[in-house]
Structures are given as C-alpha cells and as structure tokens.
Amino acid sequence: MNKQKLELTWIGKEKRPKLEPRILVEDTEKSYHAKRRVTSADFFDNRLIFGDNLLALKALEAEFSGRVKCVFIDPPYNTGSAFTHYDDGLEHSIWLGLMRDRLEIIRRLLSEDGSLWITIDDNEAHYLKVLCDEVFGRANFISTLAWQKKYAVKSDSEFFSESHDFILVYTKARGNFRINRFGRTEAQDARYKNPDDDPRGAWTSGPLQRNEARDYAIFPIQSPKTGKEHWPPKGTSWRFTKERMVDLIAENRIWFGESGNNVPRLKRFLHEVNDSVPATTWWDYQGFGHNDEARRESKALVDDADVFATPKPERLIEKVLTLATNPGDLVLDSFAGSGTTGAVAHKMGRRWIMVELGEHCYTHIIPRLQKVIDGEDQGGISKAVNWQGGGGFRYYKLAPSLIINDRWGNSVVNPEYNAAHLAEALCKIEGFTYAPSEVHWWQHGNSSERDFIYVTTQNLSSEQLQALSDEVGSDQSLLVCCAAFHGVTAAKAAERWPNLTLKKIPKMVLARCEWGHDDYSLNVANLPMAQIEQSEPVAASTLKTSKNKKPAVSNQHQGGLFGDEEA
C-alpha cells in the first residue's frame, strides 16, 4: 500500500534542470576595496556576482555548502507590479518551479544553524509557505512576520488598502538554530517610572493575580498605607503564597497606588529586566522602515537613476541580520536588486555574497557599494552603527558554458576556456577542490590528501601514462582528464596503472549537465512555454521516432577538442 502525503503540485513539477556548475571569473577592474584598512575586522573577500542567479547558486555550491549563516531574498512577487528591471508576470506553476530549484540549492548552502528569510506578498505567500515546508521540512518553519511597508492608506483600493508584506523564516535544522534578540529601545525604557522615589530606580507594574483559582493563594492582603484589604478577583488567585506575599509587601514590591487604595500590582524594576527583548511578528514602519524610506536611500546614492518600486529599507535588513547573524557571519542574497543586503551586511561587519543579472548591477549596486566602502554613504543605518567605510568586494561573472557545438554540430570544449579555467571547471564537475600545486605539475586539484586530478588537452601515450603513474606513486590516486590516450585500452590501463583513472574530454561530461543554457532567470520572456496535455494523442510512431532518435555521428570533418582550432 502506497503511503500518501500532503504536497503542493503544479504543472512541470517533476522537471528539474541539470545545472552546469559554472566557474566564477573575477573581473579585477570592477572589484573594489578601500584605500586603507579602517578596522581590523574589515572584510575584503565579499563577492558580487553578475549572472543568472540559479547558475550562480550552483556555482557557489561546491565551495560554500554548509557555510552560509543567513540567506535573505526578495524574489519577484509574481504580481505584475514588481520592479521594472524584472518581468514577474509569471504563471503560478512556472514561478513555483523556479523558486523550488533555487530553494533546494539555498538549503544546501545554509550552515546547520543557518536561516532563510524571504519577503513575499499575499499573492504567492501561501503557496510559497507550502513549498518551503516541502523543501526545508515543516518542522523547520520558524515564523511568518508581517512588515508594514506602507504608512498611508491608498484611497482608490478596490477592497483593502495593502499595507504589509510577509517575511517567511525557515531554518535548516531547528534544533541548531539560535536567534538573537533586539536591544531595548528608549521608548521601552521610558515606560518605567519611579512615582514613589524608590531607591532601586525606575519600575513598572504588572498584574499580581493569575487567571485561575488556587485555594492556597486566595487570601486578603492589606495596604500598609491605608489598611484596606484586597482579595483576588473572582475566578483568580494571587501569584504567590501568603508567606511570599508578606515578604514582597515588606520589600515595597507591591504597589497599591499613590492613594494606597488601588488594586495591588507587582513592581518590576528596570535594572532587573533583560537588556534585550525577543522580536515580535509585527514589524511596524516606525521601527523597521518602509518603501518610501528605501526609495529615498536609493535616490541619495544613485544620481538620475530609476529605483525599484518596492525596495527594502536598510533598517529592515539590519533587523533581520541582527536576529539571524553575528559579526563575521556570511550572508547571501541571490536577488540582490539595488544591493541593500550587501550594503547593510558590510556596515554591520558581516561577510556577504550577492547575485544580480540586471544592468542595475552596474547602475545601482556597484556605485552604491563603492560609496559604502569609501565611507561616503552616511544614509540608512550608517549613523546608527557609526559607519566610517572600509573593506571591499570582488566582482565575478559566470564563465560561459564549458561545452558548445562546433560548426558540424559536435560537442567540444568552449575555446574561450584557457587551460587554467578548463582545469577549474573539471575540478568543480568532478567534485575536486581546484588547488594547483606549485610543486607537482600534475596536481590541479584534490578531493582528499591523497586523491588528485590532472587536466590536459593532450593525447597521452602509454609511455606518458607510465611516467605519470610512477610519479604519483602507489599510495596516491590521480584522475587523469585528457583529450585521448593511445597505445592501451581503457581496461588494460586500469590493470596496468591502478593509481590512475582515465577519462576523455569532453565525453566524460557530456551527459552530466544542460550545456549552453545561460538563462534560468525569472524573466518570462526567456522562459519556455509549459507543456500542456494535448487534446489529441500524439501518434505512437512519432513518439517512438523521437525517443529512439540518435545523436549525429561524428564524421571525418570533426573538429578538435576546442572546435576548429586546438587551444
């Protein structure tokens, strides 16, 4: 009997992309750092990545799995009204599929005590909640927060004037998650007064009774000032025993009002309360900022530039990072938008990674970050954290696809890849860490202390393989990725050189990924149409032909490894 479960389903849910793990190529001309170190805690290895965010997440997976403390994302809301740099008028099925693919990688990137924070409106919030339950596990749902993004009523609203967005909070492993608390505010401390000049300082009062009747705690207490007796209200009882209540009255911890005749209440002194408070699920604009505030912040940093319609203010991100991270932790935003997450993380002493594909990566994010690093950005949270500048970031772009088709339709290694990039790409695909040795020419990467990889575009002879095997030694192993090997069969090679594993480029990777697919973005113009069931069945012969169709056979005109010309 099949065990059934509750799940969210949609058209195309079973289809998953075979993502190519691209390498990241730094453009040092766009990387930026401060002219001097401001503090010993300055970070310079932050990353700004230009490219499709699904491919970028996949590119980060090998190096950063289990290392990200907090992911904050503000994906297009699928409302048709998001920022003009995105086209977010997507059907529910496409949107859910795109989000699922990203969330699965995000979960792998999170540390065991890490958390995910997603802003969303009520158009997709409930679908997204169920989707996140499926990806992260319902037990790892922490809370849904309501952030008041607008403070004014929209008078022309058809039904309700929309004033808030949601923030879904998930953790990778609930048992490991520890959330910080907010520091007490002046407004919270201002609630504490000292009307009786108590030498212990300011205090506030709370109920002295509990909402249940316990016989041992039902008795009269007497006001020291007037002698008036007070009983707990019907259906309730005092919170303390008679003996403890006598002590509290003697210690002047029970307040009967200035007249001495008021309902008694328990004093709570300011110096006795925690200097921090837990966050609530209602985040009002006074404490957490609003959209208009975010627009002003963006306009102040980017001259003559359009801004996002629903940007997030720095105060909102600061609150998230206060709760979810500590100084030095790594923060990821794969929908960088105007770069607020990175800017705030930078000012708060967190390390960060941001991903953005739109041109606003150049028009908004880079100029903004440069001003942050130079200390010129004194808006947002800068004054609150005493930001003086410092640190830096490295700018990366996704490498092109490793495999392309040459003019005869044959799959070959992209000629844009030099030897170093090819070695790094194959390390990533094969699960090795790219770490070229300065001592051993054949060590391009490693997966352990004794397992290595060597990448070459040469055709290796049996003599070369023998020399390589001798140098590697019997106590180590080497994966050899080469264009071809001759003078020996694969079976004989395995017997003759047990410390070598031979694979041919590009054959070894052809079935591993979707090569040449550069855009998995949320732009509907670039998405394929969802396959809808046809009203008429497709002819069986057509299906059979399609299923059994073989790839073109290489002919005598087949090009070299890098296409028409060898690199």
Kindly give the residue locations of the regions a language model identified.
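Coupling/switch/interface segments within P-loop NTPase motor domains and analogous charged loops
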Residues: 1-14, 252-257, 468-469, 476-484, ...
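DnaQ-like (DEDDh/DEDDy) 3′-5′ exonuclease domain used for proofreading
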Residues: 1-72, 79-101, 483-485, 508, ...
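SAM-dependent methyltransferase catalytic-core segment centered on the flexible catalytic loop
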Residues: 36-39, 54, 59-115, 123, ...
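Signature of N6-adenine DNA methyltransferases within the class I
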Residues: 112-113, 122-181
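PRPP-dependent phosphoribosyltransferase catalytic core
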Residues: 353-567
